[in-house]
Structures are given as C-alpha cells and as structure tokens.
C-alpha cells in the first residue's frame, strides 16, 4: 500500500519522463484512492496535461472541465483553461492537412471556436497569467481562421445567388 505522497511522486516522475500512459494510470489511482489528499488536487491538474500529451483529447477536455467546475478559485485554474484551449487548438489543423495544404477555410471551425473561447477566458479573466501572452497569440491565429471560414461560406452563398445569406456572414 502506498501513501498519496509516494504515488504522486511516482506519477510526476513518469510525467517528466514523458511516460504518459503510466503517469495517467498513477494519477487516476491517486485521485480515486485519496480524493481528499492535498496531492489529489495537484494530481487532477497534472492529469489534464498528461491526457493532452498522451493524445487523449476528450479525456483532457473532460478533466479540465471537471477541474474548473470543482475548483473555481484554485490559484492555477488559468492553467486548466490554457490546456483546454491547447487541446482544441491541436485539433484545428492536423499534420496531414498541413502537409497536403488542405484549405481550412472550407472546414467547419467547431474546435477553433472552442479553443478561442478557452484562450479568451485566460486572457480576460487572468491577464497577468503566464499563459495570457501565448493565449493572445493563438487567438489572433484562430480569429483569422474563423474569418476565413466565414468568407468561404459567404462566397458559397454568392455563387448560389443567395445574397441575403451571404450578407449575414
């Protein structure tokens, strides 16, 4: 039987060694066995990052949402918002789309909107955060991506002579 300090230390070491699968298992075990231990709250925050780096996007989003909901006054809540934004940002164009120069303006920007919203939360609610500057930079990129999509949709409507729909874009 391990205590929460030892389990957290092992999980954190695995995370630092980029062994995301093992760190995820240990962080999950820690939060399940010792939900009220002081290490558990930090483990939940680290788990968001481990899911993100372990390419478990949905788990990362769920963990971030849960952390934000359960810890609204935590001093590092900006980090949870930032990682949440990064998860959706990473899904915005994937490497194959970049390689083959896929026109992103023709793809629905659902994840781009979610990412923009998370980064905006960091910038607006935590302007002095370590993550605010990077969030602002990513917002500029996402704003341009969203604008390109809207222009693409407007062009489509113009081709179809649906001028009212185009004007609404």
Where are these regions (language model features)?
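Acidic, polar-rich low-complexity tracts and alpha-helical solenoid repeat scaffolds
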Residues: 1-169
């Amino acid at each position: 039987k391990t205590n929460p300090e030892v389990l957290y230390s092992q999980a954190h070491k695995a995370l630092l060694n980029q062994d995301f699968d093992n760190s995820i298992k240990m962080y999950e075990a820690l939060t399940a066995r010792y939900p009220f231990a002081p290490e558990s709250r930090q483990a939940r925050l680290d788990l968001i990052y481990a899911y993100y780096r372990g390419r478990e996007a949905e788990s990362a989003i769920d963990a971030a949402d849960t952390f934000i909901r359960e810890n609204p006054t935590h001093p590092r809540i900006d980090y949870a918002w930032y990682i949440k934004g990064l998860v959706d940002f990473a899904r915005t164009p994937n490497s194959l789309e970049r390689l083959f120069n896929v026109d992103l303006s023709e793809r629905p920007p659902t994840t781009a909107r979610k990412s923009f919203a998370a980064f905006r939360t960091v910038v607006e609610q935590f302007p002095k955060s370590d993550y605010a500057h990077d969030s602002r930079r990513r917002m500029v990129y996402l704003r341009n991506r969203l604008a390109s999509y809207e222009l693409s949709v407007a062009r489509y409507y113009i081709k179809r002579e649906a001028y009212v729909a185009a004007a609404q874009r």
